[in-house]
Structures are given as C-alpha cells and as structure tokens.
Amino acid sequence: KKIKTFIYLSSDHYEKKFGYSYKFVDKKFNIISNKTQISKKNKIENFTRDIFALRKKIKAIQPDFIVVLGDRYEMLIGPIISIQQQIPLFHFYGGAVTEGSADELVRHAISKMSHYHFVATNNYKKRLIQLGEEKWRIIVTGVLSLNNIKKEKFLTKKELSNFYNFNFFNPYALLTYHPTTHELQNLRSKIQLILKSIKNKKLNLVVTYPNSDHKHETIIKFIEKNLKNKKGNLLIKNCGYKRYISLVKNSEFMIGNSSSGIVESATLKVPSLNIGSRQKGKIIPKNVVSCKYNEKDILRNIEKVHNKTFKKKLKKLKNPYENNFKISNMPKIILKILKNKNLLKKKFKDF
C-alpha cells in the first residue's frame, strides 16, 4: 500500500546564501512550502512564519501523521503542530549525542514530543529508553540514506570537473565546517588554522558552505575572503545529494566538523578528520580521526588520514550506522503503528 507524501521545506531552503537548496528536492514529491514564508529580518521571525504556514497546509491536507527528519531547530515546527493538532509524530534519528552543537538540545526535545522513533543504532535506542520512552515506540533502522549510497552511480572526476569548471584530477581535501555552540570564540583563527594545515599538504581544497547556525555569516565571509576565485580552491554553496557524495567519494579525505564526515564517509570508506567538539558523543567509525584545535595535532592527523596504509585498512570497514533494515517494509510498519490505539497516549517509563 502506498502512502501519499507531502514535503514542507523550512525557510533556509529558500535562501540565496544557502544555494536555494529547495531546487535539489526531487520533483516527484509534493512540496507544500514556498519562498513567501521567508523574512529577511531574522531567524525567529522565519521560524514563526514556518509554524503558521505549515499549520495552514496541514489544516488543508489533514495528514494521518507527520514525519520529522533530524535535529535542526527548524524541525520543531512539526512537533509543535503535532501536539496542538493531536497528529501522530514520527521522528527519525533521535537518541544520538552531539555535545558541541545546539542540535543536541533540539534532538532530545523532539524525541519527547514524538510518538514513534526510528533510530540509527541500538545505543541510541537505549538512550531514548533512558529518556522515559516506551520500548514499543522505538525501532532500529540504521541511517536509511546509506542504503542509497550503496546503489548510487557516482559522478566521475571528469563529470565533476566539467560541471564545476575545476580540475578534480588533482588531489583535493573536502572541507565542511559548521559553527559549534561552545566554540564560537576565535572562530576566524580556528578556520585559519585548518586552512593553513591543508595548505602545507599542497592539496587542492573544496569547501561546502556551513549550515545556518549562529555565526555562520562569520564563516562564510572568512572563506569567501580567503579562498574565493583563488587557484586550487572551490567554494560550493549547495551541491545536492548526488554531487555531494561524489565529491566525498573522489576526495583524498574529509576535514571539518560535519556529521557527514562521520556517517556517510564510513560507508564511502573515505578517511575523515573530525576537528573540535561539535560531534562529541557520537559513535565514531574507524575511518574517522578526531583531534583538537592544535596546529601540531591537526598536521599530524592530516598525515594519518592521507596515508595510503590507513586508507587500505578501510576496505573492510563496517559502518556502525548501517543496518539490514529493508526500506520496502516501511509503509507496512507505519500503517501498523497508526492502528495502535495507544499511539497518542504517551507514558513516561521509569526504569
């Protein structure tokens, strides 16, 4: 049985500085959001507009359930409306810990507002149980997008070179760096330290833009000032899913503090250098090396992730975020969950 799906994209997807990412959503889906929900004033106003816009759409559509994916602050609009309208809320990927990010607080808040949980690992299931969630409300699926990566036909270096007008045949590192809640001091010097360390390796550098967290403008201005239109550097606002994983696949290594440097990189068997505390608390695959903001430490670990012996060891790497869960079973599982008379009657389970 098919489930008709509607997608609401939050305001950030319609912003020029983030590359109008709404354009990368598959056209076969029913997108019910639009750029009229954006305010240029501030994020709080955008958040408020999103709530009103989504509530209006939900009133018209009358959905049987709402799905929230991830832990960005914008995701809170779904749970708020779910509670107010008494619509079942399904949350993907709760139970994780990222101590250095504001997403940490949002993730656990969404978990407590959700009626059913699809989690990445057994450890994350245990954590939700610690939060008082009933066991029957949780299923371990792994990160489902990793199944798509295994089936994906990656873009070649030639195809990427033609698209971006950049020579991908020269070895490059892929940098994604987001603001970290507890590391906002001396932000420019932290980025400068990373850039200097990569430059010492004489590698080309491909940089994707940061997310919309507080102080993202500082990062954007800095990388544009120091890297834009300079030989051997490529800045990308938003490249879409297929191009991004192709960029990862073809890179020498990933560097920065993005979750993709932990989750997706392991499936692609690409070395990754995770810097700082943004991802602290997450399960770390063996292709990932973590270090602090210290020049000697960063340089030493760049040598490690760029080492051929280290790369060879990754051939048999098992990603802890992968699972044998069959995506084709999802509609059947969801329909069964919706029949449970206690779905909306949450209890706090003491243990």
Model-derived regions, located:
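Short acidic-hydrophobic, aromatic-tinged amphipathic segments that line or gate anion-handling sites
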Residues: 33-37, 119, 139-141, 235-237, ...
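Catalytic donor nucleotide-activated moiety binding site of glycosyltransferases and closely related
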Residues: 200-238
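C-terminal amphipathic helix plus adjacent low-complexity
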Residues: 307-351
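A donor-sugar binding/catalytic signature common to diverse glycosyltransferases
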Residues: 68-69, 76-80, 91-92, 117, ...
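A generic structural motif
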Residues: 2-6, 201-204
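A nucleotide-sugar donor-handling region in carbohydrate enzymes
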Residues: 14-17, 113-189
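Active-site and donor-binding regions of nucleotide-sugar-utilizing enzymes
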Residues: 2, 14, 22-24, 35-135, ...
